[in-house]
Amino acid sequence: MSLQAPKGTKDLLPTESYKWQYLENKFRNIAADFGCREIRTPVFEYTELFQRGVGETTDVVQKEMYTFEDKAGRSITLKPEGTSPAVRAFVEGRLFNETQPTKMYYFTPVMRYENVQKGRLRQHHQFGIEIFGAKEASVDAEVISIPVRIYKELGVEGVELNINSIGCPKCRKTYNEALKKYLSKNYDKLCSTCKTRFDKNPLRILDCKVDTCKEIVKDAPIILDYICGECKEHFESLKNYLDVLNINYKIDPFIVRGLDYYSKTVFEFITDDITICAGGRYDYLIEEIGGPSMPAVGFGMGMERLLLTLQEKAIEIPEEAYVDLYLGNMGDKAKLEVLKLAKELRDRHIKCEIDHMGKSVKAQMKYANRIGAKYSMVLGEEELNTGKATIKKMEDGQQIEVDIKDIDTLIKVFK
């Protein structure tokens, strides 16, 4: 029996990797335009980080984390989300002592034990932006504008931005009391998980995926009616900034997000009923993890879900030829010259491929065509004697005679 990848994981094969490289390069360039620099954090962290950051009553912590003890008996968890590790690194690195704001981005694998389905894997990859140190609603709008630009540049249409405010701990306390009063009428119909959330964190019930609970919360009190004056002013400012940036949005009063660290602004980008990007403000997480009281905002974008969206919308990612020149050979002497020539060209950043299989010239040209080489050139006894060879443009068959010893002129063909 042949071994297979674990359930809920997917190999990224060379035939698909160009799509990821294209997106990653685009995202890096866009992040740089906003002044963000890259951060990389470990693939596993101490479990306490996610218990304190994400929240013990969340589905992520209760049901979805890959947690184990290491040989020293320490509880370790594979990273289920990207924000808490970024905050931990920010605090541990004492970046809060630097001039603020601190802007960072990351690409990271994320592991959650979820039901495997379309667009949902147990290991997926996330692109994230985190901005620390700025409390104004203008930075929320700036963060939201990054996915907007990404979708515009990729040509993704039909993406809906939904926003909400879940207030601060002070006004959320008032809302939780109203929510519990409403939910108490249907307490017996709540799922077992939501019954445990009822006293500890009733807001989490709004995020439950069980049908009976979803039906119950349809007529629940709306949190926007309970937020304090400061949170209301922040939300109004956000809407004004989005209007100035010509970013369309809808207010969805039931967006709460599945992670406990959020406060004030929360948002989701949705297409075809699938959330492809989400985020919000988390003004209390840095302090919770051991740093100073400092505001922050960010988002996470699932790479696999984005690629699925591009596929469903028939948006093709351009594939650049990964071979500039296929160097064919006829005979052992020619192969030696091909090896030397390939080295010189590769040293000048010309992507070359040569034959290592002893194929016939016909088979070599067939292979060159299959791998999408831009040009091909074959060296044999005649080419070695004359020092001249013919480069063939694979796309249209155009031929150019070149001096195989004149590397500078040869390189100009590919530029």
Curated annotation (Swiss-Prot):
Location(s) in or outside the cell: Cytoplasm
Record-stated family: Belongs to the class-II aminoacyl-tRNA synthetase family.
Catalytically driven reaction(s): tRNA(His) + L-histidine + ATP = L-histidyl-tRNA(His) + AMP + diphosphate + H(+)
Chief place where the protein resides: cytoplasm
Species, as recorded: Clostridium botulinum (strain 657 / Type Ba4)
Matching Pfam families: HGTP_anticodon, tRNA-synt_His
Record-linked PROSITE patterns: AA_TRNA_LIGASE_II (PS50862)
Name under which the protein is recorded: Histidine--tRNA ligase
BP term (GO), one: histidyl-tRNA aminoacylation
PANTHER family: HISTIDINE--TRNA LIGASE, MITOCHONDRIAL-RELATED (PTHR43707:SF1), HISTIDYL-TRNA SYNTHETASE (PTHR43707)
Enzyme Commission identifier(s): 6.1.1.21
GO cellular component: cytoplasm
Quaternary assembly: Homodimer.
CDD domains linked: HisRS-like_core (cd00773), HisRS_anticodon (cd00859)
Keywords, sorted A to Z: Aminoacyl-tRNA synthetase, ATP-binding, Cytoplasm, Ligase, Nucleotide-binding, Protein biosynthesis
GO molecular-function term, one example from the UniProt record: histidine-tRNA ligase activity
Leader sequence segment: none
